[in-house]
Amino acid sequence: QHSMVKFSLIIPCYNEASGIPALFERCQEVFQSPEYEVILVDNGSTDHTQTLLAELLFKQPIIRTICLNTNIGYGKGILAGLESAQGDVLAWTHADLQTDPQDVLEGFKLFSQTRNLQKSYIKGLRYGRSIPDFFFAVCMSCFETLLFRKLLWDINAQPNVFSRTFYDSWVDPPHDF
């Protein structure tokens, strides 16, 4: 059976039980078409995140979960979700709703309008940060730009949206982001 999923959003969750109901509700509001899937990766939570995900899961066919028994790092949670994703366009973001799922949807739409889908990478941009946080982001951006010889800005901003082809080309992706 051919999957209708075009867009996959991966959201790693670690001890996010207090925020899971709001995250789940917001994802239900934003992603209503079968061309979207949301993969919540319980990354070895020690609170009741996994139980909450199981209780809420039956309410929405677009949302599914992956449960890892032990926390193996944020990056491993992302990679577990990416490996399971069915979409041609992939994304990830944080579970704490610092990035609204609507912003991810806008990222998916923007990505779909780019000319070279295989080489495009959509990245969020954070506004209104404290001066120390902004200064740290500037320093990290300078370091990353020098290291990779490509202009990079605020590498930790969310969401991240890219093609399956881009993901498949990763020879040795980092295991922690």
Predicted regions located by residue number:
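Short, well-formed alpha-helical segments that are part of the catalytic scaffolds
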Residues: 16-30
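Acidic helix N-cap motif at the loop->helix transition within catalytic regions
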Residues: 18-22, 47-56
